[in-house]
Amino acid sequence: MHNGTPVGPVAYTPMADAAAERGLRLIICARPGYGDSTPRPGRRVADVTDDVAAVLDELGAPRFVTVGWSGGGPHALACAARLPGRCLAAATMAGVAPFTAEGLDWLAGMGEENVTEFEAAVAGVEQLSDYLDTEAADLATITGPEVADGLGDLVSAADKAAATGEFADYLAASFRASVRTGTAGWRDDDLAFISDWGFTMAEVGAGAPVAIWQGDQDMMVPWSHGTWLAAHVPGAAAHLLPGEGHLTLGITSFGAILDGLLASAGLG
């Protein structure tokens, strides 16, 4: 599984349980710059497949299915494009579309905080780093009860209602972990998103079966990103869900996403 941005290598127990119930191991890798993973400045989205292949080799896993949540979405698509035959199926869960996607206003519909963040990314590394360092100071100590309000305009009413209890504690732990050693991972994720990803949507569709999951109550990655991906990844199965937000998909749909991956891979 590819976590979002900025999210450290922290597993949500109900997700791990859902995977285990289906005979799957839930594996989460820290992308370069997160946690104890060495930064890789200038990395592209496609570069994640080097690390995925190395980790799976070490674990003795010759084949896999993958899901990417939010900023993890592009990295799941990279696996479909760059590891055909080994990646048997891929899904995005509220995943971002390419920054230069034709016909897509990438920032439209995002919460103010995301707009400010990616405007800084476009302005350059120095401006982005300054912005992220300021934001990281709050994330470094955030607690579960603070998550819903701390995300500001990035949470819809649906997501705010979901950000409670065990799920909120998981989100807080993942945010704290993401900036424990600095903001290099977050910075390089953002810069990779607004740059060439290193593969095409045609390569994604040719590499493995793909499913696109998206809710219309998402202020982090708007509905338009999901509809664009569904229309431009050849053969993609579209699961465009009214009433779902960015966070709620992880609660309500994760089991169904895994079931879909297994069925698409011929393992269901």
Enumerate the predicted regions with their spans.
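Conserved hydrolase catalytic core segment
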Residues: 63-106
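Short beta-strand/loop motif that positions the catalytic acidic residue
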Residues: 206, 212-214, 218
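Conserved acidic catalytic loop of the alpha/beta-hydrolase fold
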Residues: 47-65
